[in-house]
């Protein structure tokens, strides 16, 4: 059974619609979806003419032109400094958004923004800081993970500053050679002062996304240990219930799929992280290659998450935008409560990855 068989209908043609309108809020003004659908769902190479055309449209249509129009000549947005504030118009958030929307890493404006961030947002411990004057007490997993994921997408994998932040991220998770503070990341295993010193699953998802974006053969031993710690933590609860340690009750944000997520997370993101690690194609919580290959619905901890994701599709195989930052960014992205190309893309990536995990396990068991 292919991943499309799990859908009530095939939304791929909808995702592949060409950019026909630039009307604010129009789902047709999000050319990044077409680019990513061609690349990630149809497996088209980067030099494919349609892929190249779709990627070029990203820089001229939709949210990215509005973001770049607001950039100051020195490379920052709104005001000089580390760029965390104001949410969600400061420098930090634009770099994250540019990467998520598919900005061209070679664009001079994008490079200028990345360089400004790297030169003004890193604390003495090597991590990114949320404070206007970057100090170690402002280093938190959600921020560091989001920015590392963005910078890797934007071509900075070999930059020593990025590699230092990766090392901090991994060591802050495992507790190796890290001096924790009362503010910010306050202990190993994703402990965060914003969560009353408890492990933060939102931060865990962001940190894990950043670490698993590093190719396996390029991960350091401490990165691999951190990934194992993160997987164990995320699998310690049912992602569909999301009753991870929290300040009060479980946040309803977990159950509302959105784009972009910023520092928030949802069930779909947790599932995406675990499936990317190879969990989900077998009958246990062991990653790909260690078990029998029976199917995601039988996997403890992931079965409910998978069914929850599928239950949210409509009759056309689309997912709604339930969580949004519209009105707070330089440009709105789709409309809340309406079918979302971005959220649908997120869901389909997970479904396709599950099929890849299953296929790999079937091949290894032969």
Q: What name fits each language-model region?
A:
Residues 1-366:
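Preference for long, amphipathic alpha-helical scaffolds in soluble/luminal domains
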